[in-house]
Amino acid sequence: MIPDKYARYRPEANFIKRYMDEKCAAESSDYDPNSNVSSKNLATLASESGKRGRIYTSRLMMHDMLAAMYGEEEADSYINNLETHRVYCHDETGQIPQIYCASITMYPFLLHGLKGLGGTSDAPKTLQSFAGGFVNLVFAASAQVLGAIATPEFLAYMNYFLVKEYGEDYYLKPDTQAELFGRKRTIDNVITDTFAQVVYSVNQPAAARGNQAVFWNISYFDEPYFRGLFEGFAFPDGTVMTDLWESLWWLQVRFMKWFNQERLRKIITFPVETFSLLNDGKTAVDQRALKHIAEMYAEGHSFFTYTSDSVDSLSSCCFAPDTLFSIWDQHNTLLVGAAARLYQMLEQEQDFRVRVLLGEEVVPATFIRLPGRQMYFITIDIAPNARHMYEVTDNHLFPTRRGDIQAKELVEGDEVQYWDPENRVYSYRPVSEVIESANTYDYVYCLEVDAGCEPYFMLPSGVITHNCRLKNNIVENQFTYSLGAGGIATGSKRVMTININRLVQECGGDMAKAKASLDDLTAHLHRYLKAYNAMVKDAQAKHMIPLYDAGFVSPEKQYLTVGINGLVEAAEYLGIPVGDNKGYSEFTDLILDTIHRRNVADAEPGVMFNTEYVPAESLGVKNAKWDKADGLSVPRACYNSYFFAVEDPRTTVLDKIRLHGNRYIRNLDGGSACHINLEEHLTARQYELLILNAIHEGCSYFTFNVPNTICSDCGHISKHKLEKCPKCGSENLDYATRIIGYLTRVSKWSAERKNEYDRRYFGGQEYEDQAES
């Protein structure tokens, strides 16, 4: 008989046998199946077989940290909430304490290559070295996180190298002859070959990701969004990024069209694309971009659109031009004066690097100028007879006793952090007045404190203010919008999700009791997330997170995320019709407002919470299974990932947009993606009208999904959902669509997700009829 020390591993041995017998990798996984694993082999098995041990190790280390920070009772509650499935911790199978996802800035790569991530490659000097180095960057960065990596600057940096090699007007002469590896090629050939090199390389299996492709996201920008995000940014040789806008616009269009056509040759999953579109509340500011987006949807391309009425997700915390600043320039000269005047002085020197005070510490920063926006007057009582009034942008963040609060959300009586020079301590001073300003400015000004420093600086009065993050996404509703919706150097450190359906049913449908229970559970979740954050900070201090050390990601700009799942199912349990109605609106608002208020109350300097309607590719299935096993009401085998029931034919296209609009998501500060499944593509004009409708409703993040058809016999791919191959006549077909956030073959999905796909309602005819009328 085999000794017990070996026999106790029998479950692992059985798992290996079972895994090899299953049809596909997603169906074989016991822990976190996902359709991004396109093949099943010993490499994917090696990744799967150790996951149970990593989960237990993760829970043990979290228990230890929680016990040290909050006591044994809190630590025990963590294990209990996980094991009773009230709470789910995403990617527990990863190496603790890896961060969850990141939208990286590529500037350190431009300066130092991959040396900051432990590589040997120098900074890229040519287009080809950029392309090769970029692929390695994506793999190296992805190895440091549990989930997705976004590189919003990818095309802007590629454009820079194209300009260096072929001139600023290269986009006007794409058919001009050029050389690539000694071959005569056109400039356009070089560009599309580079696209192919990067895209096909990144879609290969990665050893550090369990032999699956990395989750890679990129961004496109309209002109005002781009200028708002990159105003003042210069490449190392002094080239101003915004001066290259027209060539970048051409390159963005070229990539989208190339990628759309390439997907007729292969079903390519990554990158997940997001087009950032600025609106004025009624329409797109950049009409060229609006029409291009609509045309690409009509041509069958699959991408997300993110629309906002400001670039506040990407820049924040600015002051009026006459605000008094005190700084030291690079010559160690103390400069005191109005922000606009100081900026002009630095502009003459062409050096915006400065130093600024934070208490008694001097910290490095960069002086920044950004386009003007809505302003507010904030009056702070420094002393009994000393009041200071500041004119700041509406999204300016003030560190208060209740966390970092935007100017437009400050209220009389809030207390703002202040440096007391006499006693040499930090204290707080009350806000006495908050007034919306009627002033308009071409530009507003602030300082961006260097990565690695606390994100604050001090005004001459002693008031502490949050610094400007030129490439930030601090406040608006963003899909892990921290990822791929425009934000740079951001992301999420950890995501833990509440099962709303279970919580409501455990309270017997009593919503007063459910609200109190949700508030209490969210408070616990915050302590769990803070414990994980402490582990991340400890790892950072020991230089275990090179993404932080090298400046690719700013830890102070990463969220601790509270996820939700089972919202639709909870409403159904309560007998509330899931749709655009008063009862459902009040229910969703109660849930999201409760979490949002707790997020605000528990925030503190260096700790930001947000709430996300998580995609839940595997969690939607798990929660349904766990709840059903415990005798709870479970209406479907996979919980929804949207504010509507995905199979409901009564929910129109316009309903879906409204259900993901301001009326429902105003307190969902971490984002949700509205997936609109269509039977067939619409016209460009119809898509344009839908985008305008999304702007009107405040639906900020959305995409349209029409299944692609793949012939399993001849390999032909169509952008349409067909019943027979138009090339060979075969009915042996596969389909490709978004399982949640990314495009894959349905045949690669888990059995439960395949069943969920079969139930999806692919509508759109009702909208076509409305549009025609």
Predicted regions located by residue number:
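Metallocofactor- and cofactor-centric catalytic cores in central/energy metabolism, strongly enriched
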Residues: 189-192, 573, 758-761
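A short structural micro-motif
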Residues: 201, 742-745
